[in-house]
């Protein structure tokens, strides 16, 4: 156990309660935070679901709003003293509606998983049939995977991708829907590198009399700028996280153009699934939505996609197999089987070299989820940092060096990894965080 945990806690008296900084009262926590800052500052982040928020977003999240309970919705709270947090939440709602060109928004979900759960609570009954993309094809746990609540409470039917193209086969999805007659079909996922045809999904749900829920957590930033087609004209309800490509605080959100569905969603979020909203996080969401409404955000998203294409192209020249042959979005899947490597093995080697990513299953993967045959890479965080095409070309070459080093020495190649780590640190020093 860390020796710092056994140290006596300082006495924080009323006289210094509002003035004593974290470093003076909780040195173990402060040290861990500082170490994490150093890690983020000195390493390259390629986890596709992560990003780097602005200083303004962080400041909003660290305000006195953390003190305020506000069960209910603006103008309809169960507590007094909510006039100012009402303003904050209404700003977040109006900006979300403007950003995604929709009629209704609920900004209270604590996460994307909570948002998905609230939709299911609002629109489904236990035992109903749902259809979602399988995990190995690029779906998400909350879309009906067996370990998740959605896989336990509902009759979850999973669709996959075409074995040849590794993309969604809409004819196969239609055939499954006609066979199983689901109450809801879920589109979206956590590892889909190609554009999703939401109009095709709407055609299928209309044919079988189902509801269409789109989880756009990964592509929300792309949708906001028009870089990916919006699901709002087609979906009955849309969920998203507020981080990832949207570059806000960690949280969730639910959007719809249906007043009837909106009312059900509001009741499902509170009091159905959650209690008090996290008002400091909602403030940070409002700030992030405001940033995303600015013209520079479109430039950012265009760079995210361009950088992803560059990274994929470089990796292909280094002998890597990119699932579907490339990407239309911010992420890519690398099939490691041609190099005889495993996802967990490569994740660890890249981290030793100062590059963080995650092991990830690939379509029709025969490896266990904690091993996998692939890795997932994304460009949002690096692009937020200021990396452009030239930097991502370098990053692609460094990843290629680490992979080739592993092929030569499967237990790890310290010489290669240490050399890459030096280059990574030098690059990161040119693009510091929060300076």
From Swiss-Prot:
Key word Chaperone present: no
Modified residues (N6-(pyridoxal phosphate)lysine): 244
Keywords: Amino-acid biosynthesis, Cytoplasm, One-carbon metabolism, Pyridoxal phosphate, Transferase
Residues at the site labelled Plays an important role in substrate specificity: 243
Gene Ontology process terms (BP): glycine biosynthetic process from serine; tetrahydrofolate interconversion; tetrahydrofolate metabolic process
InterPro entries: PyrdxlP-dep_Trfase, PyrdxlP-dep_Trfase_major, PyrdxlP-dep_Trfase_small, Ser_HO-MeTrfase, Ser_HO-MeTrfase-like, Ser_HO-MeTrfase_PLP_BS, SHMT-like_dom
Residues the entry annotates as binding (6S)-5,6,7,8-tetrahydrofolate: 135, 139-141, 260
Major location (coarse): cytoplasm
Pfam families per record: SHMT (PF00464)
Pathway entry: One-carbon metabolism; tetrahydrofolate interconversion; Amino-acid biosynthesis; glycine biosynthesis; glycine from L-serine: step 1/1
Keyword Transferase (UniProt): yes
Localization per record: Cytoplasm
Cofactor requirements of the protein: pyridoxal 5'-phosphate
E.C. number: 2.1.2.1
GO cellular component, one term: cytosol
Top-level lineage group: Bacteria
GO molecular function, one term: glycine hydroxymethyltransferase activity
Reaction(s) catalysed (UniProt annotation): (6R)-5,10-methylene-5,6,7,8-tetrahydrofolate + glycine + H2O = (6S)-5,6,7,8-tetrahydrofolate + L-serine
Function summary: Catalyzes the reversible interconversion of serine and glycine with tetrahydrofolate (THF) serving as the one-carbon carrier. This reaction serves as the major source of one-carbon groups required for the biosynthesis of purines, thymidylate, methionine, and other important biomolecules. Also exhibits THF-independent aldolase activity toward beta-hydroxyamino acids, producing glycine and aldehydes, via a retro-aldol mechanism.
Entry similarity comment: Belongs to the SHMT family.
Subunit structure comment from the entry: Homodimer.
Protein name (Swiss-Prot/TrEMBL): Serine hydroxymethyltransferase 2
Organism: Vibrio cholerae serotype O1 (strain ATCC 39315 / El Tor Inaba N16961)
Name of the gene: glyA2
């Amino acid at each position: 156990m860390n020796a710092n945990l056994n140290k006596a806690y300082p006495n924080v008296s009323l006289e210094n309660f509002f003035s004593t900084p974290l470093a003076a009262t909780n040195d173990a926590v402060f040290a861990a935070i500082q170490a994490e800052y150093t890690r983020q500052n000195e390493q390259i982040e390629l986890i596709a679901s992560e990003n780097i928020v602005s200083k303004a977003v962080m400041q909003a999240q660290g305000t006195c709003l953390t003190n305020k309970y506000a069960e209910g919705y603006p103008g309809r709270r169960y507590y007094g003293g909510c006039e100012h947090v009402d303003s904050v939440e209404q700003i977040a709602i109006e900006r979300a509606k403007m950003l995604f060109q929709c009629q209704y928004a609920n900004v209270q979900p604590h996460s994307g998983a909570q948002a998905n759960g609230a939709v299911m609570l609002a629109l489904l009954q236990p035992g109903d049939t749902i259809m979602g993309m399988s995990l190995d094809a690029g779906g998400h746990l909350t879309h009906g995977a067996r370990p998740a609540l959605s896989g336990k409470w509902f009759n979850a039917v999973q669709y996959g991708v075409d074995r040849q193209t590794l993309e969604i086969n809409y004819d196969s999805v239609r055939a499954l829907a006609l066979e199983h007659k689901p109450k809801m079909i879920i589109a979206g996922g956590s590892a889909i590198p190609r554009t999703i045809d939401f109009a095709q999904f709407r055609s299928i749900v209309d044919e079988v009399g189902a509801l269409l829920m789109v989880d756009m957590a990964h592509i929300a930033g792309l949708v906001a700028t028009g870089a990916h087609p919006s699901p709002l004209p087609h979906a009955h309800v849309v969920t998203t996280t507020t981080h990832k490509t949207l570059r806000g605080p960690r949280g969730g959100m639910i959007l719809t153009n249906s007043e009837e569905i909106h009312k059900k969603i509001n009741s499902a979020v509170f009091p159905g699934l959650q209690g008090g909203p996290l008002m400091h996080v909602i403030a940070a969401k409002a700030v992030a939505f405001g940033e995303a409404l600015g013209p520079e955000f479109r430039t950012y998203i265009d760079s995210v996609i361009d950088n992803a294409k560059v990274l994929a192209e470089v990796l292909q020249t280094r002998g890597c197999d990119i699932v579907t042959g490339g990407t239309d979005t911010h992420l890519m899947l690398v099939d490691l089987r041609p190099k005889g490597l495993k996802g967990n093995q490569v994740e660890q080697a890249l981290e030793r070299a100062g590059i963080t990513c995650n092991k990830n299953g690939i379509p029709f993967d025969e490896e266990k989820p904690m091993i996998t045959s692939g890795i997932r890479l994304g460009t949002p965080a690096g692009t937020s940092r200021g990396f452009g095409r030239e930097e991502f070309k370098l990053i692609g070459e460094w990843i290629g060096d680490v992979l080739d080093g592993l092929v030569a020495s499967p237990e790890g190649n310290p010489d290669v990894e240490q050399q890459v780590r030096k280059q990574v640190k030098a690059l990161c020093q040119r693009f510091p965080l929060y300076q």
